[in-house]
A protein has these predicted regions:
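AlphaC helix of the eukaryotic protein kinase fold
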Residues: 92-124
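Conserved small/polar residues in nucleotide/adenosyl-binding loops
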Residues: 289-296
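Activation-segment/catalytic-loop signature of the eukaryotic protein kinase fold
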Residues: 137
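Conserved short submotifs of the Hanks-type protein kinase catalytic core
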Residues: 141-155
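Protein kinase catalytic-loop region centered on the HRD/HxD motif
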Residues: 180-191
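AlphaC helix of the protein kinase catalytic domain
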Residues: 156-167
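Activation segment signature within eukaryotic-like protein kinase domains
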Residues: 175-176
Length: 301
């Protein structure tokens, strides 16, 4: 909890203020913590950009750490995504700066630029219903940060697991339609997502359900002339052109991945790798998947 001058402190989970004599937030039940859960995390209460108070960690992976944070200017809760590739950098407990080895610096700097490019890509679509809002991005502590709206809900892959592997046709179509709208907007700006899959689709809960297409970190301009091409692969969802360096990617790359995601939602079975399907492919009819679908829905799979 962050101390205030008027004998009040702020909870690092719900960010409401309460008396500093208490060790448990009376609003959300969050227990006061004075240091990070993991040595590599920023300590709760850390100030970023002289504006954002870091709170609890809401997600962490090999490429970054996402914190819940308090925007002191707008007085609202946001999400702050920290660029942190765990195999390239580390952080000493209690310190803010990331530590980059000399051998890793070139790769880290390159990927940091890609991270900031993700922020710029997302910022172009601030008013889009199906793309997360980005408020700001900046560099600090030897790394970079993206400030975006805090989403409440779960990733599609987690939802599928919760639902036993597959969902009903109507909801699957809603999800695919919203993702399709997001992709249409990206493609209109000549941006290819390259990583459409259940773990990058987020189902927001609240007064109304919203679908968000996440992680534009792999996104690339369709006509890019970069000498370095990252090969982004997600078996079952990546089309053949993503398995080589031919640069032959385009809107069709994302459409294939969306189709594979729709197949997974409807059947509970991840499609075979596209490279295998080029050799031998037998499309499983809807009737074989025990779906209760209309005849007009059979084209979906």
């Amino acid at each position: 909890m962050r101390r205030r001058s008027n004998n009040m402190k702020r909870c690092f989970s719900c960010f409401k203020e309460f008396n500093e004599s208490l060790s448990v937030c009376p609003y959300c039940g969050h227990v006061e913590i004075t240091k990070a859960e993991e040595p590599i995390y920023l300590a709760p209460g850390t100030m970023l950009a002289n504006r954002y108070i870091v709170g609890e960690v809401v997600g962490a992976g090999g490429f970054g750490i996402v914190y819940k944070a308090w925007d002191t200017k707008l007085e609202t809760i946001v999400a702050v995504k920290e660029f942190f590739i765990s195999r390239l950098v580390t952080r000493a407990e209690g310190l803010k700066n990331v530590i980059i080895s000399k051998n890793s610096k070139d790769e880290f700097d390159y990927r940091k630029e890609r991270f900031l490019a993700e922020a710029k890509n997302m910022a172009k679509f601030g008013s889009h219903r199906s793309i997360p809002n980005v408020f700001e991005f900046f560099e600090e502590n030897n790394t970079a940060y993206i400030v975006m709206e805090l989403l409440r809900g779960m990733a599609l892959n987690d939802y599928l697991n919760q639902m036993g592997g597959k969902i009903d046709v109507d909801f699957a179509i809603v999800i695919a339609t919203e993702v399709g709208k997001a992709l249409s907007s990206l493609h209109a700006e000549n941006i290819i997502h390259r990583d459409v899959a259940p773990d990058n689709i987020f189902i927001c809960t609240g007064k109304e359900i919203k679908i968000k297409l996440m992680d534009l970190g792999a996104a690339k301009l369709a006509d890019s002339t970069d000498d370095v091409i990252d090969i982004i692969l997600k078996p079952g969802y990546s089309p053949p052109e993503q398995y080589d360096n031919t640069k032959n990617i385009g809107p069709w790359t994302d459409i294939y991945a969306l189709g594979a995601t729709l197949y997974m939602m409807l059947t509970g079975v991840k499609p075979d790798e596209s490279t295998n399907r080029k050799i031998s492919d037998e499309l499983v009819p809807v009737s074989y998947t025990h779906l209760r679908a209309h005849e007009t829905d059979s084209y979906l799979v």
